[in-house]
């Protein structure tokens, strides 16, 4: 019986190249992004992380919820083998696209941290801040800085992200 070795994205495409591609995406879309391996472990430092998300992640509960949302979004993208949208625990829109090589899922490209439509109302935001043991006013101030985008913008960004994921897959496949 032949044992199959675990293939890792980082073995096929170096972290600097992944970071450069991620940063180009962030610069173009002004959205947050990050690349994780097949287990949901970040390979790159996320770029364009909003002040709102940094505030939430400063809370232990918030950080755990954010990590869970990222893993669930990446898993959904990997399961569907396509770019997917999802609403995070804080009400922001995120998206994820799988990175595959020869039908093996090696990671995902996640992005977003934006609002489509109306932001949560003040009462909901204050309640969320209290659940995370965060200062409600700081939470509201940070929430006001979150980019508000149209559905078309988020669709375009997700499609571009998926195209980038396919390019990463091609690069990795050529090195495999």
PLM regions and their residue ranges:
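Active-site gating loops and adjacent loop-to-helix segments of metal-dependent hydrolytic enzymes
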Residues: 130-136
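Short coil/turn segments at secondary-structure junctions
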Residues: 5-9, 145-148, 152
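Structured interaction and signal-relay segments at domain junctions
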Residues: 2-91
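Signal-transducing alpha-helical linker
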Residues: 10, 17, 153-156, 160-176
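Residue-level signal for secondary-structure boundary elements
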Residues: 30-33, 64-67, 151, 169, ...
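Sensory/regulatory domains in signal-transduction proteins
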Residues: 68-130, 145, 152-156, 160, ...
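Alpha-helix initiation and N-capping motif
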Residues: 49, 70-71, 122, 136-139
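Regulatory/sensor and coupling segments of signal-transduction and defense proteins
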Residues: 138-149, 166, 173-176
């Amino acid at each position: 019986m032949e044992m199959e070795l675990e293939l890792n994205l980082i073995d096929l495409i170096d972290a600097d190249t992944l970071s450069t591609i991620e940063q180009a995406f962030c610069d173009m879309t002004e959205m947050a992004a990050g690349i994780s391996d097949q287990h949901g472990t970040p390979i790159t430092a996320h770029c364009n992380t909003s002040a709102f998300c940094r505030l939430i992640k400063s809370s232990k509960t918030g950080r755990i919820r954010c990590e869970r949302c990222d893993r669930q979004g990446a898993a959904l993208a990997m399961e569907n083998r396509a770019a997917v949208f999802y609403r995070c625990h804080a009400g922001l829109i995120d998206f994820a696209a799988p990175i595959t090589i020869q039908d093996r899922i090696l990671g995902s490209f996640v992005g977003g941290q934006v609002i489509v439509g109306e932001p949560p109302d003040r009462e909901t935001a204050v309640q969320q801040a209290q659940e995370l043991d965060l200062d409600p006013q700081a939470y509201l101030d940070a929430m006001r800085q979150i980019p508000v985008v149209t559905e078309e913008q988020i669709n375009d960004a997700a499609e571009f992200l998926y195209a980038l994921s396919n390019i990463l897959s091609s690069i990795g496949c050529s090195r495999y």
